[in-house]
């Protein structure tokens, strides 16, 4: 029998980075850029949920993760590092970290530690957000919810899209919802999982 544990974590990220961020553009060192991919970065005091959905993407082209966020400082500036507990299409061995600068309270610039990319982000109104992270055996569950937007992530560290393209039970779910303007119901906006599998 597995016990479901609600994880109470100390703050690891300054309050100024909390909230829902949307990416405006990424510019890569090779000169290519992307301003059309839908990206949602939900940041709580200690962990984050991130979903990226390219325009007209297939399932395997989406990327997402949920896990702990760590802030540190170097001579180059403040650093945020994202350490996924679960991810889609799978957990990578690569370090995910960047130098971050707030140009205004609602405008953030991120630069890769190796200079391989620059990203511009803007904060989206989402009211006061609540968050939870729990573990049931090897199953992680994350929820970050505001007054307008909500993100849910569920999966295992061993989940992988590759080799299981037709078996969504082996995929980590990361879903973004928006509250309908005329009701209190949450409407699914985007997910790593197909809608038919979620219901």
Task: List PLM regions with ranges.
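Lipid interaction determinants
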Residues: 2-64, 74-199
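Catalytic phosphate/metal-binding cores of nucleic-acid and nucleotide-processing enzymes, i.e., regions
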Residues: 68
